[in-house]
């Protein structure tokens, strides 16, 4: 009986010590496994979140461009055969400076408009540009082109599908160079092809959209 009591007493003394060992925390292997899982979630999740944000922003960017085009056309209506010969980056910057959808970076001749659909939004990447164009043998400046470069594939073909409603020509450069997906300036005309537009987009921020208006 005394032997049993002594054994129980020893077990009682050792119990806190064993409990103390169990409370030391996670092992290095366990911490490494948790870190690896968190990194994997970040690698998979961040691009998916980015694509979701861009996809939802695309209609707002397209509508902002449509408003700009409508204003520019109304301001230059009746200005001869080449009303857009003087359009440049300043034209776009001044019109977009108060926008809550796109952002203007810099000032003066070095200012640029970031579309927010891919790219850095500076240094000529992920920006919107404008330039005079000609269509169907017309004078240079009879039309103008708006280009969005470094666009993420999540904006395709939504961006083209919305803006094409008011554009005469739409081209997409992505998978296989510059491809015309709509051209109403020639005979016979080429209606917009959404499937062709979707096929041209390549994964990542590597797509360029150009819309020509007159």
Q: What are the functions of these language-model segments?
A:
Residues 47, 66, 157:
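Short alpha-helical basic/polar micro-motif
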Residues 2-4, 8, 14-61:
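N-terminal single-pass transmembrane signal-anchor helix
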Residues 12, 73, 161-164:
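Residue-level marker of positions within ordered structural domains that often coincide
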Residues 81-214:
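Periplasmic/extracellular, small/polar-rich flexible segments of pilin-like filament-forming proteins
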Residues 12-15, 29, 55, 71, ...:
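Generic signature of intrinsically disordered, low-complexity segments enriched in small/polar residues
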Residues 50-100:
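Membrane-proximal N-terminal amphipathic helix
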């Amino acid at each position: 009986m005394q032997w049993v009591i002594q054994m129980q007493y020893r077990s009682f003394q050792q119990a806190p010590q064993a409990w103390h060992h169990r409370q030391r925390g996670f092992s290095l292997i366990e911490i490494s496994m948790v870190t690896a899982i968190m990194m994997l979630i970040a690698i998979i999740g961040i691009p998916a979140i980015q694509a979701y944000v861009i996809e939802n922003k695309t209609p707002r960017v397209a509508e902002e461009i449509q408003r700009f085009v409508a204003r520019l056309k109304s301001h230059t209506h009746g200005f001869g055969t080449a009303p857009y010969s003087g359009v440049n980056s300043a034209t776009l910057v001044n019109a977009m400076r108060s926008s809550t959808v796109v952002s203007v970076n810099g000032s003066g001749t070095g200012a640029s408009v970031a579309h927010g659909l891919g790219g850095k939004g500076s240094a000529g990447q992920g920006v919107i540009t404008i330039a005079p164009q000609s269509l169907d043998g017309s004078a240079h400046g009879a039309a103008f082109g708006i280009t969005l470069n470094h666009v993420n594939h999540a904006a395709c073909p939504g961006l083209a599908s919305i803006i094409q409603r008011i554009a005469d020509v739409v081209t997409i450069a992505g998978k296989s160079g510059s491809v015309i997906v709509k051209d109403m300036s020639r005979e016979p005309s080429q209606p917009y092809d959404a499937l062709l537009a979707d096929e041209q987009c390549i994964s990542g921020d590597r797509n360029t959209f150009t819309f020509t208006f007159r």
